[in-house]
Amino acid sequence: MSDHEGMRRRDVLKGIGMTGAAVGIVTTAAPPALAEAQAQEAPHAHAHPPERHADATEIFRYFTPPEAATITALVDTLIPKDDVGPGGVEAGVPIFIDHELAGAYGRGARMFLNGPFAQGTPQQGYQLPLPPADLYRVGIADLNAWCVKTRDGKRFDQLSVADRAVALKALEAGQAEFTQIPARAFFNILLKNTMEGYFADPIYGGNRNNAVWAMIGFPGAIGMYEEDIEKYRNKQYVVAPKSIQDLS
């Protein structure tokens, strides 16, 4: 992939957009995209989680198929596959994000989501009334609506690799015209969760097969090194990464 076709891996790993601007709205009414999605969920997707089976870790639990296509394209644009290491999609990041949103994190279990809501300062952090799962749903709807309006009627996942990069940079800069939430709010949480999934223990769905840890030389969840001290004294410590599941 050329530098002009997408966002380069080093751009992400250096932390583009890591300092998110505080965002806020002054209404607690459900955005149209969220209200529509909630009306279609009968029963709610979280009410009866699907039974786990052999390939349950590869199943989208929260995103609808169109939403999954968009989030997959977003992750692929943020961290494309190259000769340095696996891309975000190859590493399972879309599944990581989806499974996080399907659980307590998505519901905002540890977030204070009561009003009043007002425009905050950068130091005050997240100021929206939406938990992460709802923020993603509304953000994806706004993103695709903006792309359809400004990109010849195409959703984000239908754009070329180069056009996706341009759209994502506009999103990061807050230049994308969202109607329900601030564009930067969606970009900030997307980037944060993408990086978390890329470097997480594989037990959570991302960093598939420890490939990202191997790329950066991280040994994994090893609890002690006493038996290796003499073996590797004055030598480079090179071992295959071990995940939580590998050691359980």
Segments predicted by a language model, with ranges:
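Intrinsically disordered, low-complexity glycine/proline-rich and charged
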Residues: 18-28
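N-terminal secretory signal peptides and thylakoid transit peptides that target proteins
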Residues: 3-20
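C-terminal segment of N-terminal export signals and the immediately downstream linker at the start
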Residues: 5-7, 26-73
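Mature-region segments of soluble proteins
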Residues: 2-5, 55-57, 66-73, 84-248
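A generic structural motif
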Residues: 80-81
